[in-house]
């Protein structure tokens, strides 16, 4: 191994299932050890970042100005530019704790819940092209409910582990709820009766009923991406030479995902089929009309539900567990499978019969799933266990990346032995602190934003000018698609409209629920809004492009926003 220049990296040694990263540091200056300048480290984050910078001989940039801080924090926390009046008041304020106070204020604004619900929808893959289309709410209605649920949980500051529990263990019915009661409740959401909100219910079943999330292998891939920040695609057919996961690991892990299914037309229990048909009759729907089915039927049901009538809905629930096999019966089945005389069709039938009876969490031991009511409960318990190396690190790394445009592990969705963190002590501090503070999302935002590390200026010095991974300075970054789109609208709006947009987020792009093939917003597309379609954080692009420049200088939408009645220019 030959060093080509100063900096830090890892040398990865691997053999079979063993993967060991070895950190390597070549100081960028002679300012190491006793030669390193005294550095103020007011927070644990600052001290852990400084520990790495001291080894590198890298001196961090100065803390940014008040104006830079306010703009940065407002955009990052709420997805919103600070209004002029707020900026002027903040710059006049001489309080020594005004930055901390501003962070607390921003975390209570509507923009915080709107923007971070959108980011959680990115990571959980809320795409209106892929969500369930086999129910009256339709794809867009389901996508709206998904965002509404996320927004409500973020606004309530529900602990992250409870948000995840509501997704992982999701089912359509509440405990003890009959099919009729379930349909009445869902119909009330479409009718918006008495302020009924889908966000009030404990579960998010749409996560499990996506069109590209039905097969066990699809669910294994998506689950690992969303909640663990782990890529296991390669292990579907082979062991990647730089990763630890084998095909056997993948096959055993996917067995957790066999038993969540979608029930249409009251088909979950035998006696509910008649309830479904009676419901259609009560709605004056001809059940013998063969042309009235599929989307045509669902659109009619949606119209009736909006008018306040109770209509039947599709539901998601785990199937019944398989009965346990005796050792003798299992041995007999295996003997048949391994027999040279068995026909292929019979062999496949027996293999399907055995499938899903055992499963293994990533890096764990084999578990029996026979007679387990819901295998997802085992998955959740494993993720929330303190010894789990992925769950807490995955979310704190993603949130960190949102603030710095680079993760402690980069890419943020690739936690693996061959892709180690740039600062493992920092990642572990945040993950452990997140657990100890009961998975409080606002604790995490607060801890990051109050650090000098987050508040560094962008101006580099000779020691950190080439470093964009050790957090010694703020790295210039483009605003996300939704944020820049809203910023342009606010900047071109008249004073009253601009103030209203800053405080009312429902019509803002940061609260957009139309991600997918039915979203025809050209501006959001060219600025890289997440497509939410490939189990990869790279679905969102932060790269600049020529099309973005052309849009800002010459697009009709842009020119109309400047010249329209009520714009800032019109007011002048």
Enumerate the predicted regions with their spans.
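A short, structural micro-pattern
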Residues: 5, 18, 247, 482, ...
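Residue-level detector of short, conserved catalytic/binding motifs and their immediate flanks
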Residues: 9, 232-235, 547-548
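Primarily short, surface-exposed interaction patches in extracytoplasmic proteins
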Residues: 37-111, 116, 124-501, 538-540, ...
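Long, His/Glu/Asp-enriched segments that create or flank divalent metal/ion-associated functional microenvironments
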Residues: 489-553, 559, 563
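Residue-level detector of conserved, well-ordered beta-strand and adjacent loop positions
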Residues: 25, 254, 528
């Amino acid at each position: 191994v030959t060093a080509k220049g100063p900096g830090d990296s890892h040398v990865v040694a691997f053999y079979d299932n063993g993967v060991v990263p070895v950190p390597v540091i070549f100081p960028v200056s002679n300012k190491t050890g006793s030669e390193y300048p005294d550095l103020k480290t007011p927070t644990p984050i600052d001290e852990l970042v400084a520990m790495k910078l001291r080894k590198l001989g890298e001196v961090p940039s100065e803390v940014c100005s008040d104006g830079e801080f306010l703009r940065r924090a407002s955009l990052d926390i709420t997805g919103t530019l600070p209004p002029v009046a707020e900026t002027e008041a903040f710059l006049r304020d001489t309080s020594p704790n005004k930055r901390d106070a501003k962070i607390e204020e921003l975390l209570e604004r509507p923009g915080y819940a709107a923007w971070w619900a959108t980011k959680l929808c990115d990571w959980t893959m809320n795409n209106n092209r892929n969500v369930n289309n086999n129910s009256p709410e339709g794809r867009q209605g389901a996508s709206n409910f998904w965002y509404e649920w996320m927004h409500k949980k973020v606004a309530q500051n529900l602990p992250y582990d409870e948000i995840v529990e509501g997704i992982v263990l999701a089912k359509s019915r509440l405990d003890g709820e009959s099919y009729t009661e379930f349909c009445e409740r869902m119909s009330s959401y479409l009718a918006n009766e008495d302020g009924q909100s889908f966000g009030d219910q404990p579960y998010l079943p749409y996560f499990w009923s996506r069109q590209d999330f039905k097969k066990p292998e699809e669910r294994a891939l998506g689950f690992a991406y969303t909640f663990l920040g782990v890529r296991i695609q390669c292990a579907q057919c082979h062991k990647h030479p730089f990763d630890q996961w084998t095909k056997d690991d993948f096959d055993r892990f996917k067995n957790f995902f066999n038993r969540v299914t979608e029930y249409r037309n009251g088909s979950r229990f035998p006696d509910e089929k008649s309830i479904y048909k009676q419901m259609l009759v009560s709605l004056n729907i001809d059940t013998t009309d063969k042309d009235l089915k599929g989307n045509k039927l669902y659109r009619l049901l949606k119209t009736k539900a909006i008018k306040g009538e109770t209509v039947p809905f599709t539901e998601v629930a785990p199937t019944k567990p398989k009965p346990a096999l005796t050792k003798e019966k299992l041995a007999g089945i295996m003997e048949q499978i391994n027999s040279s005389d068995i026909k292929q069709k019979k062999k496949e039938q027996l293999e399907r019969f055995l499938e899903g009876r055992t499963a293994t969490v990533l890096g764990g031991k084999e578990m029996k799933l026979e007679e387990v009511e819901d295998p997802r409960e085992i998955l959740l318990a494993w993720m929330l266990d303190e010894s789990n190396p992925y769950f807490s690190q995955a979310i704190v790394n993603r949130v960190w990346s949102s603030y710095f445009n680079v993760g402690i592990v980069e890419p943020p969705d690739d936690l693996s032995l061959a892709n180690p963190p740039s600062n493992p002590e920092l990642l572990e501090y945040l993950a452990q602190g997140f657990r100890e503070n009961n998975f409080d999302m606002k604790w995490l935002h607060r801890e990051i934003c109050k650090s000098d590390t987050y508040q560094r200026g962008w101006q580099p010095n000779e020691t950190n000018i080439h470093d964009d991974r050790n957090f010694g300075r703020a790295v210039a970054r483009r605003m996300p698609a939704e944020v820049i789109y809203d910023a342009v609208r606010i900047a071109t709006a008249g004073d009253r409209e601009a103030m209203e947009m800053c405080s009312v987020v429902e019509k803002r792009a940061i609260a957009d629920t139309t991600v997918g093939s039915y979203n025809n917003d050209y501006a959001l597309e060219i600025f890289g809004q997440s497509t939410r379609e490939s189990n990869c954080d790279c679905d969102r692009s932060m790269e600049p492009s020529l099309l973005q420049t052309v849009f800002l200088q010459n697009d009709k939408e842009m020119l109309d926003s400047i010249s329209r009645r009520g714009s800032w220019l019109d007011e002048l």
